[in-house]
Curated annotation (Swiss-Prot):
Sorted UniProt keywords: ATP-binding, Cell inner membrane, Cell membrane, Lipid transport, Membrane, Nucleotide-binding, Translocase, Transmembrane, Transmembrane helix, Transport
A single GO cellular-component term on record: plasma membrane
Source taxonomy: Bacteria, Pseudomonadati, Pseudomonadota, Betaproteobacteria, Neisseriales
Species for this entry: Neisseria meningitidis serogroup A / serotype 4A (strain DSM 15465 / Z2491)
Catalytic activity entry: ATP + H2O + lipid A-core oligosaccharideSide 1 = ADP + phosphate + lipid A-core oligosaccharideSide 2
SUPFAM superfamilies per the UniProt record, alphabetical: ABC transporter transmembrane region (SSF90123), P-loop containing nucleoside triphosphate hydrolases (SSF52540)
EC number: 7.5.2.6
Domain notes: In MsbA the ATP-binding domain (NBD) and the transmembrane domain (TMD) are fused.
Keyword Transmembrane: yes
Record's protein name: ATP-dependent lipid A-core flippase
């Protein structure tokens, strides 16, 4: 099918992804059929306007003619011939032609305009709706992807897939479909007119079609990899812009404006270079196609003049032929130039389908416990992030009782955060198993598993919405009284009172209107409202001043009441009251016990505590 539509320029394998996306168009097939009918109207009126010239010159300036003698023979062809003769006489043969001919011309142009508007509107409508559906499915797919995918894939690439490539694949498809159908119909109609007027001259016109097809194929092959590289470069640019925007404080603090500008300039130059190649090919394509068309036109004029001198054609037929041929030039040029946007469309469709085919997060669990008690056990758990054999956790074993507060301490890279990320299955173990209340977490449905946890981390993320909506995110059915209670428990009553909007004050992008301590306490309020049986704290009090830390610590104490808690600590002074402290190094447990027990051993924990005390002394000095 695609070979026929593109005159052999593209093959089935080139359009496999694109044809898959066309499944999104099927619900709108009635509108597409209506658009096709309108496109046919455009092609028919365009063709007839060319044929209009011959009778205008041959009959328009002559005296009124006698009524035609109609055939008495039966049959469809005779009937159609009689209708044509009567219509020609009504328009061109009577003395009323001084107003019927202009009126007929106006009617033709109006019909063409209505058909052109209808086809453009319907195809644009289908394009917009299709893009909306594809983006909806892509966003739904993004929500199913694993945390590892989001960590390893730049945000600019995801944005390019969802915005740029979707637009390129579907919008280009709408334009290309319109060009292919409308201009093919126009060329076909005008070719019929040419054959009707002079079949010998028409053969010369037809001979240029294969030459234009070969020219388009040459530029398609030349630009395939250039267009692909250009799309990838745009994704890289999106990522550079996103990183610079998100990290604007780091850029300013370290005077990294020049470095950021250099990164942007490098990728921008790459895009410019690739765009120049595409533009050069596109610009060179038009003159070559024009040269082929002009040679054909020159030959036609030469032969037509010779035929006219020898009485084989009338002036009206010659003028109509030239007009029809000139009218054919624009659609032929559009068809000849379509290979480049079509190549872009196919490559964009490949990118969209590749994203839609990304494997979702594994969820093979079948169990759906409503609320667990909070007993946790790790059995011989290994975690390998990389393929070089280095393990983040190595034979990790740990049992946590219901309601127990367990703190994980150790140097950076010892595996503390990995333990926390394993429980909601943000990370999958390479070996071993993890159980909650004796149930392997791999056997629990992901949504039910994650409903058992509340997470407060050092990397707080807040939405660009109101305070109320950010807290209620953990429980969308919560009312204002419940949200207010959670905020009060998180020591945020003063924040509510400080704004006339109270609970409904906007907090800015990622809580940019709040202080660090306030952002942390909003995250705690969100966790309090969720009321999950297991609490995960990943360095929740790091990088806070003393007063903010005190308020956050008070909120955390309220949050951890009657819950199993796993606390990743950087400041060891914050976990002295933990029921048990687990000391880790190189993915293994090397010490465990209460604060007093570990200090009495004068081991690794004592060393970490001494280092922490020195750091605290430096901060307060």
């Amino acid at each position: 099918m695609i070979e026929k539509l593109t005159f052999g320029l593209f093959k089935k394998e080139d359009a496999r992804s694109f044809m898959r996306l066309m499944a999104y168009v099927r619900p709108y097939k009635i509108r597409i059929v209506a658009a096709l009918i309108a496109i046919f109207g455009v092609a028919a009126t365009e063709s007839y306007l060319a044929a209009f010239i011959a009778p205008l010159i041959n009959h328009g300036f002559s005296a009124p003619a006698a009524p035609p003698e109609l055939s008495a023979a039966a049959g469809i062809l005779s009937t159609l011939q009689n209708w044509r003769e009567q219509f020609t006489y009504m328009v061109w043969g009577t003395e009323n032609k001084i107003w019927t001919v202009p009126l007929f011309l106006i009617i033709l142009v109006v019909i063409r305009g209505i058909c052109r508007f209808t086809s453009t509107y319907l195809m644009t409508w289908v394009s917009v709706m299709t893009i909306s559906k594809i983006r909806k499915d892509m966003f739904a797919k993004m929500l199913t992807l694993s945390s590892r995918y989001h960590q390893e894939t730049p945000s600019g690439t995801v944005l390019m897939n969802m915005l740029n490539l979707t637009e390129q694949s579907v919008s280009n498809a709408s334009d290309i479909f319109t060009v292919l159908t409308r201009d093919t119909m126009i060329v076909t109609g005008l070719t019929i007119v040419l054959l009707y007027l002079n079949w010998q001259l028409s053969l010369i016109v037809v001979l240029m079609f294969p030459l234009l097809s070969l020219l388009s194929r040459y530029y398609r092959d030349r630009l395939k990899h250039v267009i692909s590289d250009s799309q990838k470069s745009i994704g890289t640019m999106n990522n550079v812009i996103a990183e610079t925007h998100q990290g604007h404080r780091v850029v300013k603090l370290f005077n990294g404006q020049a470095q950021a500008a250099n990164r942007f300039d490098a990728i921008n130059r790459t895009i410019v270079r690739l765009s120049k190649k595409i533009t050069q090919a596109t610009a060179a394509h038009s003159p070559f196609s024009e040269l082929i068309a002009s040679i054909a036109l020159a030959v036609v004029i030469f032969i037509a003049l010779w035929q006219s001198q020898n009485g084989y054609t009338t002036i009206g037929e010659f003028m109509a032929f030239i007009v029809a041929m000139l009218q054919m030039y624009a659609p032929i040029k559009s068809l000849a130039n379509i290979s480049i946007p079509m190549q872009t469309m196919f490559l964009a469709a490949d990118g969209v389908c590749a994203f839609l085919d990304t494997p979702p997060e594994q969820d093979k669990g079948t169990l759906a416990p409503q609320r667990v008690e909070g007993r946790i056990s790790f059995r011989n758990v290994d975690v390998e992030y990389r393929s070089d054999g280095i393990k983040a956790l190595d034979g990790f074993n740990l049992d946590i009782r219901q309601g127990e507060r367990v703190a994980l301490v150790g140097r950076s890279g010892s595996g503390k955060s990995t333990v926390v990320n394993l429980l909601p299955r943000f990370v999958e173990p390479s070996a071993g198993n993890i159980c909650i209340d004796g149930i392997d977490i791999a056997d629990i449905k992901l949504d039910c598993l994650r409903a058992q946890f509340a997470l407060v981390s050092q990397d707080v993320f807040l939405f660009d919405d109101t305070l109320f909506e950010n807290v209620r995110y953990s429980r969308p059915d919560a009312g204002e009284a419940e949200v207010l209670s959670a905020l009060q428990a998180a020591n945020l009553q003063s924040l509510i009172d400080a704004s006339p909007l109270g609970l409904h004050q906007p907090i800015g992008s990622n809580g940019s209107n709040l202080s660090g301590g306030q952002r942390q306490r909003v995250a705690i309020a969100r966790a309090i409202l969720k009321d999950a049986p297991i609490l995960l704290l990943d360095e929740a009090t790091s990088a806070l001043d003393n007063e903010s830390e005190r308020l956050v610590q008070q909120a955390l104490e309220r949050l951890m009441e009657n819950r199993t808690g796993i606390i990743v600590a950087h400041r060891l002074t914050t976990i002295e009251g933990a029921d048990r402290i687990i000391v880790m190094d190189d993915g293994k447990i090397i010490e465990q016990g209460t604060h007093e027990q570990l200090m009495s051993q004068n081991g690794y924990y004592t060393m970490l505590r001494n280092i922490s005390n020195k750091d605290a002394a430096v901060r307060t000095a």
